Amino acid sequence: AEVLTSEQAEELHKHVIDGTRVFLVIAAIAHFLAFTLTPWLH
């Protein structure tokens, strides 16, 4: 495997962080909807 330069590594890291944020937002919305639309934990 070729070694990433620091610039490439930073770019890759940004994509990973963005993907994680998107996933967390979607998960949070899904949990919120599940909480409000079902008797779950009421």
From Swiss-Prot:
InterPro entries: Antenna_a/b (IPR000066), Antenna_beta_CS (IPR023623), Antenna_beta_dom_sf (IPR023624), LHB-1/5 (IPR002362), Light-harvesting_complex (IPR035889)
Parts of the chain that traverse the membrane: 15-37
Residues exposed to the Periplasmic side: 38-42
SUPFAM superfamilies associated with the record: Light-harvesting complex subunits (SSF56918)
Keywords, ordered alphabetically: Antenna complex, Bacteriochlorophyll, Cell inner membrane, Cell membrane, Chlorophyll, Chromophore, Light-harvesting polypeptide, Magnesium, Membrane, Metal-binding, Transmembrane, Transmembrane helix
Signal peptide residues on this chain, from the entry's feature table: none
Topology versus the membrane: Single-pass type II membrane protein
Pfam families referenced in this protein's UniProt entry, alphabetically: LHC
Binding annotation for a bacteriochlorophyll: H13, H31
Residue ranges annotated as Cytoplasmic topological domain: 1-14
One MF term in the entry's GO annotations: bacteriochlorophyll binding
Annotated compartments: Cell inner membrane
One GO BP annotation of this record: photosynthesis, light reaction
GO CC, any one term: plasma membrane
Function of the protein: Antenna complexes are light-harvesting systems, which transfer the excitation energy to the reaction centers.
Subunit: The core complex is formed by different alpha and beta chains, binding bacteriochlorophyll molecules, and arranged most probably in tetrameric structures disposed around the reaction center. The non-pigmented gamma chains may constitute additional components.
NCBIfam families per UniProt: pufB_517_ASD
Family to which the UniProt record says this protein belongs: Belongs to the antenna complex beta subunit family.
UniProt-recorded name of the protein: Light-harvesting protein B-800/820 beta chain
